[in-house]
């Protein structure tokens, strides 16, 4: 089974971008262009447009903060040790433990009595508990990230 079956591309982009941001001094800003440039050192086909969409979703979910203006960019919405992979998954994937595996929802004739649904729900709960135990700080700690040349470390005026 491929790793990609458990994690969406959107989740992968977010994890990489957040780990990069966590390696910078707290309150430092990162632009989408900077994040995309670094991500292209990890995989050449990283899309800046797709990354921008992911970062905007993270901003709407409070994981990152948007800073407008000429010297704007994004910063982490809270300290990296306070952002779990579960937080990221919930913002990006809309995690729901009530989903029927056949997408029947409330119309399922076996609602509450389906062995498959109970088993899958149990697996999903365990998966989410595991994600909750891993912070962005832990993820970043195991990474060596070189900030691309020409990128300055800008601090948010709000911090």
Q: Which residues does each PLM region occupy?
A:
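Hydrophobic aliphatic residues
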Residues: 39, 92-93, 131
């Amino acid at each position: 089974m491929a790793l990609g079956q458990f994690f969406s591309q959107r989740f992968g982009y977010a994890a990489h971008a957040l780990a990069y941001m966590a390696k910078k001094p707290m309150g430092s800003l990162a632009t989408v262009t900077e994040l995309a440039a670094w991500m292209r050192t990890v995989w050449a086909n990283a899309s800046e447009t797709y990354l921008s969409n992911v970062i905007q979703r993270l901003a709407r979910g409070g994981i990152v903060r948007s800073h407008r203006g000429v010297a704007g960019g994004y910063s982490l919405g809270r300290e990296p040790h306070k952002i779990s992979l579960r937080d990221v998954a919930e913002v990006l994937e809309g995690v729901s433990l009530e989903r029927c595996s056949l997408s029947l929802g409330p119309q399922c004739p076996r609602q509450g009595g389906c062995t498959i649904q109970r088993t899958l729900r149990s697996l999903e709960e365990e998966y989410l508990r595991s994600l909750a135990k891993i912070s962005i700080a832990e993820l970043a700690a195991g990474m060596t990230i070189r900030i691309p040349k020409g990128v300055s470390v800008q601090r948010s005026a709000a911090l």
